[in-house]
């Protein structure tokens, strides 16, 4: 049984009152002890409807409830208890020394264990485990029933099948403070989705097939971009997650961000910084299509290496679905330009006035997102997010220098690796994870997007000033 502390009227605890197999004065005393252990003398039970009757235990000494349930819901940022029954001989009849129960939470960001106390009642014994929940997520439990009176200590039983699912509150503090609904519920978002789809289709109409053919014949820039985007940058995210010991949700957000394809206006920055614009558009198209394979793969690999998969479900299928939502209209645009060039030109003309609407809507949603996502942001992820675009720019330029590419292509490769589609990463996280987990993980792409835009604008301004001070004759 899992019980939460709260103020208010008390509720009957199944299994420790008159209905759960505990009778008489000793049973009432057991119930009283549980109430004393919780301030205010009031409890709210978790959503699982279970009993602490010592019945079905599937051949185990330890059980929670009747043994038929192994996953229990618990609210976020709360304190409470877990009642674990024990049928170990000696503890149930009080004739032998009491064993000791060790309880370990395998994700302390989601759930921490405060204390473990042994209890007895007329029909058996068990343990009361004090818990404190943090972020929403799944916290597996590791139970070890030990007999320390033996030499060496005897491991009586070990269980790893129980877990506590910490669920987010219905109303987040940030939403209550700002009187705003969550940005994912904003109708503007749903109004912009068709425009985003058409905009991506029009982007595909800008891809020059001749440039794509040239890239296939001389694939050095394309290969360097793919190498930087899907090998070097995800590995950098992995290193930063290790060095700064980022929480698992943040680590996942950073991995997905650094595994994202080029985008975020990279071809515009190529134009402003003297890069090869047609190459930039083609590289963005190729990396977006390639991301449908590479991004889920790198997310799965690094999630395993960082043990994220143990406590946080990484929804690879949803990530892939979000990528396809972007890749399919871009590919459709390429086909339209090839087969229907006049319609392609018309589409480009039609989307131009709506681009301004997309820009305004994007700025509004970005502000609205920041209200939720940046609540409680900490320094480590800010520092890491600030370095990601800079490292990408340096990696891309260094790789291009190694192959002695022309200056314009060097700048394009550098920008394609450094300016990743962080907003795509943010969308994948928001559509794939539960709300609180998604908002927490989204701190990484949001900060990377802010940092990347600021740093690229600084480069544009710097080059503009340089061109004025040192004009080319």
Curated annotation (Swiss-Prot):
Q: Which residues form the signal peptide?
A: none
Indicate the transmembrane segments per the record: 25-45, 221-241, 249-269, 277-297, 316-336, 356-376, 381-401, 413-433, 446-466
Q: Does the keyword Membrane apply?
A: yes
GO MF annotation: an example: symporter activity
This protein's major location comes to membrane
Any one cellular-component term (Gene Ontology): membrane
List where in the cell it is found. Membrane
Going by the entry's taxonomy, the superkingdom of the source organism is recorded as: Eukaryota
Which protein are we looking at?
Answer: P3 protein
